[in-house]
Amino acid sequence: MTAATIPGLDSAPTKHEGLLAWVREVAELTQPDRVAWADGSEEEYERLCAHLVEAGTFQKLNPDKQPNSYLALSDPSDVARVESRTYICSEREIDAGPTNNWMDPAEMRGIMTDLYRGSMRGRTLWVVPFCMGPLNAEDPKLGVELTDSEYVVVSMRTMTRMGAAALEKIGDDGFFVKALHSIGAPLEPGQADVPWPCNDTKYITHFPETREIWSYGSGYGGNALLGKKCYSLRIASAMAHDEGWLAEHMLILKLISPENKAYYIAAAFPSACGKTNLAMLQPTIPGWRAETVGDDIAWMRFGKDGRLYATNPEFGFFGVAPGTNWDSNPNAMKTIAAGNTVFTNVAKTDDGDVWWEGLEGEPDHLIDWKGNDWVLRETETKAAHPNSRYCTPISQCPTLAPEWDDPQGVPISAILFGGRRKTTVPLITEARDWQHGVFIGATLGSEQTAAAEGKVGTVRRDPMAMLPFLGYNVGDYFQHWINIGKQADESQLPKVFFVNWFRRGDDGRFLWPGFGENSRVLKWAVERIEHKADGKSTPIGIVPTAADLDLSGLDVNAADVDEALDVKVDEWRAELPLIEEWFEFVGEKLPTGIKDEFDALKTRLAEES
């Protein structure tokens, strides 16, 4: 079909010539049956959900258990981000750097254009306008996703400010990021569809200079909801580098002292390391409270007062289900229980509820994430996929900070870097200054999780928890962080801390109880900001003793806390060649400032007896 004969092209609710021309071009290439413009309304959402139920993609859950909620089971080959198929196609290979897959942009466009040709046949091309961050921000970051997946349209309504209001912001000539997505599963006339269409060939491609995203073959979250990692981190990090701000893989937490003073903390952890749990923290120390601003992504800019302000560009939570329960994260459970949730790849109970590993109560019988019968103590496989998800509106979170949607953002007092390490890294360490903090973030390591492909359990370097999400060269990224610090008075900058909730004893036990008790560790960080707490200078930074932490009412072995805080010089000396190897991998663009910090660490460790 030509553009003239594709229904929906001539009834567009916009006069934006660039947008109209792009939609027309994509429609002619992909050959959908029709074009539809998503308006983000409740009526549209309900209509699409009903259609997805009819198609077998969604199963409606028991409204008494999970109101207005649905379960989707993906194709078993389409369950996580596909880092091996994710590309940063900058004009020059050096600008993608050693951590990214690169291909010449012209070559990639050629390959993907061939894949897109006719890829939407038998389907609807949805035009999905969206805004990352508050619509009334001074510089709203806008985008339009073209997709042939109704699952994506429904999820984008939850995860972004999507629809007519975003289209209005784009106006008749506004800039927007072009995000093109196709599941790559055309339907011939009369051909039956499958519940989760996708393609064995997958590409998730970013063109940083032109601010474009092209995704093909996957219907799964991070590969298909292009406002999430693709825009909010990969493209936004390139924008932030050019414009002098930070786009980071961080939660934003509001911690409130008994004196009613608020401290905003941004924290970077690799996927599945407790980011959402910390974002929805329930402090166990009397008088302390916490509220949630965001659980995954923080965009940080300097305010007029010289402080760093953060906004959460997202509109919902796309959380990992396994391990989430009423004990580990009651606020996430309350958010989900409010309804309006799309679950992907969790198990279904016989009474139409959902279940996953770690959730209270083990049902005798389930339908697992592959649609098969699962019997307690008989079935050996997991009922829910380790990377199964819930997609739910942020507005339902009972601990949501009232200012979460403030276009100015919230002033950040502390930045935490943390990963999952069994040894070496203490419970908390304070960086000596901003540049030392950048070094800590640059050397962050974590054990591999199920949220990405790869062998679970091996430690990989994950700088600032951004390894899979950098839109440009990692060395330039480190230098950008150092430069950000030079833009401000050191006294105005957030203090930087390094945390590790996951240290284990020789017998394999966790040394620290974690979860709500982490508020005790954050209290020390806040008291360091206020110059009220002591700490011990060590070769790796300033570390509290057990006496510096508020452990009142905590049933924990004092020796365990001492061990959790211990700086073992031998373990750190063993870490040095691993850091050296990582920096060699980063290559020629490793900043001098980072090399200086590394040399200083080596010297301090050598001086220890």
Curated annotation (Swiss-Prot):
Which InterPro entries does the entry mention? Answer: PEP_carboxykin_GTP_CS (IPR018091), PEP_carboxykinase_C (IPR013035), PEP_carboxykinase_GTP (IPR008209), PEP_carboxykinase_GTP_C (IPR035077), PEP_carboxykinase_GTP_N (IPR035078), PEP_carboxykinase_N (IPR008210)
**Keyword Cytoplasm appears in the UniProt entry:** yes
Sorted UniProt keywords:
Cytoplasm, Decarboxylase, Gluconeogenesis, GTP-binding, Lyase, Manganese, Metal-binding, Nucleotide-binding
- Protein's job: Catalyzes the conversion of oxaloacetate (OAA) to phosphoenolpyruvate (PEP), the rate-limiting step in the metabolic pathway that produces glucose from lactate and other precursors derived from the citric acid cycle.
Tell me which residues this entry annotates as catalytic: 273
Cofactor binding remark: Binds 1 Mn(2+) ion per subunit.
Catalytic activities: oxaloacetate + GTP = phosphoenolpyruvate + GDP + CO2
One GO BP on record is: cellular response to glucose stimulus
Q: Where does GTP bind?
A: 272-277, 389, 420, 515-518
Originating organism:
Mycolicibacterium gilvum (strain PYR-GCK) (Mycobacterium gilvum (strain PYR-GCK))
Q: Which named protein is this?
A: Phosphoenolpyruvate carboxykinase [GTP]
* GO CC annotation terms, alphabetical: cytosol
Query: Main localization of the protein?
Result: cytoplasm
Q: Which gene encodes it?
A: pckG
- Subunit structure and binding partners: Monomer.
- Known pathway: Carbohydrate biosynthesis; gluconeogenesis
Summarize where Mn(2+) binds, as residue positions: 229, 249, 296
**What family does the Swiss-Prot or TrEMBL record give for this protein?**
Belongs to the phosphoenolpyruvate carboxykinase [GTP] family.
Cofactor section:
Mn(2+)
Judged by the first EC level, this protein's enzyme class is lyase
Q: Which HAMAP family match?
A: PEPCK_GTP
Listed GO MF terms: GTP binding; manganese ion binding; phosphoenolpyruvate carboxykinase (GTP) activity
Q: What is its EC number?
A: 4.1.1.32
